[in-house]
Amino acid sequence: MADSKTLLYSYQRLLEAEESRDIFQGLTEFEVMTAVAYDYFAHEELDYVIMEVGMGGRLDSTNVCQPVLTAITSIGLDHVALLGPDLASIAREKAGIIKPGIPLVLGKLEAEASQVIEGIAIQKQAPITAYDRDYQVELEASCLSGQSFSYHSSKREKAPYQVALLGHHQARNAALAISICDVLFDREGRELLSRELVDEALHQVVWPGRMEVVSQNPMILLDGAHNPHAVAPLIASLRELFPSQKKTILFTCIRTKALEEMLIQWQELENSRLILTSFEDPRAYSQEEIRAAAKKHQLEEVNWQEFLKN
């Protein structure tokens, strides 16, 4: 983890390098931080860096490096105003990270998105490793300590693993990570990581805000699902882990997200009580708008600070 002094050093270097070009005019915070991150990574001489795209891919500020491997985890209808109205359009933007001859690893994708992405990869002669075709995942037990699954591919024999995250989708994400490591190590002529080392690493995974258990008594989970594509697996996981227990959902989102669609999803969750709230942020729905949505769907609306106190 970089400390503040190191980050300020990289930021100062960036300011000095671009002082005469007025390049900072109109830049977003994410673009500035991406540039600072690249400078920091170069200064630290790291062996590998995992850069996550901010939005889309083709025009994203992270898409300025020459990668050793690219990966696309999943695609849903999000940021449609900027990326396009359908999965095919969004897939084309995501595929902008694909580079000629550089391996591409794919997670579980809808056929519409997969067809677009694989077509672009073939055009660029980027070797493809695809979910369910080149590597397989068999979902097993779920519990509050994590998700068990088995994994196998042409590079790795079938074996059991457990990731310390909740939800079947996290098992698929873990499988994608295994495949990425195997493809990368194979490309570099290195010995693959042992099953024991991979499993040990997966047991140590921590992902704040992703079905994060923040209290056992009472049981409280924190999750950042903010679009229908993310809400669906969250609801599926809650159904599996807490089938008969009563569940209270405290929910809100920002203006650019599909509030109405997500409310319909949440109302289909059995044994649950859905409560809406608002928060202070320029992008957030106002308290009045949240109250109107609550009234329309016959839901409760609360102040989240007061709710947590009680």
Question: At which residue positions do the language-model features occur?
Answer:
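A conserved short coil-to-beta-strand element within the FAD-binding core of flavoproteins
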Residues: 133-142
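C-terminal helical cap/extension that packs against the catalytic core
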Residues: 110-120, 125-129, 219-222, 228, ...
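Conserved catalytic-core segment of NTP-binding enzymes
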Residues: 55-59, 65-126
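Short catalytic-loop micro-motif centered on adjacent basic/acidic residues
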Residues: 24-28, 104-107, 221-222, 248-250, ...
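Active-site-proximal loop->helix
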Residues: 1-14, 81-98, 117-120, 259-265, ...
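ATP-dependent carboxylate-amine ligase catalytic core
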Residues: 1-65, 83
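Acidic-glycine-rich active-site phosphate/pyrophosphate-binding loop
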Residues: 7, 142-157
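Nucleotide phosphate-binding/pyrophosphate-handling subdomain across enzymes
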Residues: 48-53, 60-63, 67-71, 75-80, ...
